[in-house]
Amino acid sequence: MKVEGGESMHESEEGRDVPNGITKHKHHIPFQCIVSLPSGFQIEKPNDLKLVYDVSHLSMTKDTCKKRIEIDECGQVEIDLQVLKIKGVLSFIGNFSIEPIVCENMYTTVDRNPSISLSFQDTVYVDHILKYSVQQLPHYVIDGDHIQVRELQIKLMKENPQSAQISGLFCFVYE
């Protein structure tokens, strides 16, 4: 469905139309990291949370399996079902800015701004079926256009205000 301005729409689980990309993608893997903030520092606001991810350790396989289906007035028939699967690891590294809670007695080697980037890294293991088809599957590419990060966010943990939780989704955008 298209709305004014050309934005694409789809029906949500609740049955209402929403812009694409707003709700969770069908094929996704969630991730989260917990990062300790140094004593006396807080998350700088606004913050540009940045993530770099490596898709070079992912591979795609196409397999064929047999599936029995029921056909009206014919009974059961066995068909070849094509399966597209992505497997491997997604490594990522990211950073966000922190700043002193109190700037008094804080100094820096560059300019006067005492904010600094704090980094984190992790790996997500991937073993995910992307598609089933009765037709031959075309060639698919593993790249940043088809594997995207969505809903990337950072928040302080209520239980421990010196820890930040970074979370998001790796979405597999293959039609």
Curated annotation (Swiss-Prot):
Protein name as annotated? Uncharacterized 20 kDa protein in cryB1 5'region
Induction data? Transcribed starting in early sporulation and into later stages; not expressed during vegetative growth. First gene in the orf1-orf2-cry2Aa (cryB1) operon.
> Native species of this protein?
Bacillus thuringiensis subsp. kurstaki
Q: What else is known?
A: Encoded on an unnamed 225 kb plasmid.
Q: Where is the composition biased (Basic and acidic residues)?
A: 1-17
Q: Where is this region: Disordered?
A: 1-21
One short Pfam name that applies is CryBP1
Domain of life of the organism encoding this protein: Bacteria
Query: Which InterPro entries does this UniProt record tie to the protein?
Result: CryBP1
Record's keyword terms, sorted? Plasmid
